[in-house]
Amino acid sequence: MGVIEIENLSRKFGDFTAVDGLTLTIAEGEVFGLLGPNGAGKTTTIRMLAGLIGKTSGDARVAGCRVGDPDTARKLRSLVGLMPEEAGLSPDLSAARTLDFYGRLYGVSHGMRALRTERLLTMLDLWDRRNDRVRTFSKGMKQRLTIARALINDPPVLFLDEPTANLDPEGAKTVRDFLLELKADKRTILLNTHQLAEAERVCDRVGIMHTRLIAVGTPDGLRGATSQHATAIQLAVVTDAVVVAARNTSSADVTVAGNTITVPVDKPERDNPELVKAIAAAGGEIQFISGTAPSLEETYLRLLGSEKNDKVAR
């Protein structure tokens, strides 16, 4: 059983389907990233799981609490930390007083509030601004403070809606390093993002979403399952016989640039030995071999493109 269990979860707004039959299990201590374009249903999913909006159909449990059940709603709020899309911070409170206020709401003791405030603000590079009013903060600083607010009661589950959006590279690195620390603490995290590089660095698994879940897996697994690698072979001379031999080993187009021939391959460990053998048999004098793996962005765009084509066909 997972800490987050979602079964056939859907949400409609009138005739518009925002989330369509989402089924997903997220294990304890896992960092899971939802990827998708605007309007894909990522924020709606987080809002449903946090109990902020109701579902149209389906079922979900978070940390043992059934989402939408009034008997466990209070417990659910205590077990889940939420960084929403909009910060919703009081502009006249300082960073430290903001965390103290929310800590009191959750019943955190005075001593523990002070310890967590110092730890969270230090880790998110806000400690030097702890006594400054939120109205003086940049958008990125408010975003980091919102993450700290979500953790003031030390919840085992954390939902983050675009945690690195609007951050400069330094701010994004601060948040990324912070998430890696949380990951080491075995906290279960569900985040959504447009930042594919961030997801690749932080997430154990990712799901590509476009109202429904298109694909789920590790970043490496998705790349290998949906996109081709390429092997580039530099030769003394590229002859017609070498090109023919390379094409006979690949179902995709072979390209030639100068003395380098590039061949798409599905599984390099399986296909490259056969490719090298065929080129050598055709008289090719191989000087250097290199390989390139598809990026997560290429995989993401390929899957989204296929999904859009399927929707048009349907």
Model-derived regions: residue spans:
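Hydrophobic anchor residue at the start of the ABC signature
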Residues: 147
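Catalytic Walker B motif of ABC-type/P-loop ATPase nucleotide-binding domains
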Residues: 158-162
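Conserved ABC transporter NBD signature motif
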Residues: 58-69, 75-76
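Helix-to-loop junction immediately C-terminal to a conserved catalytic motif
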Residues: 50
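Conserved ABC ATPase "signature" region
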Residues: 100, 104, 111-129
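ABC transporter nucleotide-binding domain
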Residues: 176-266
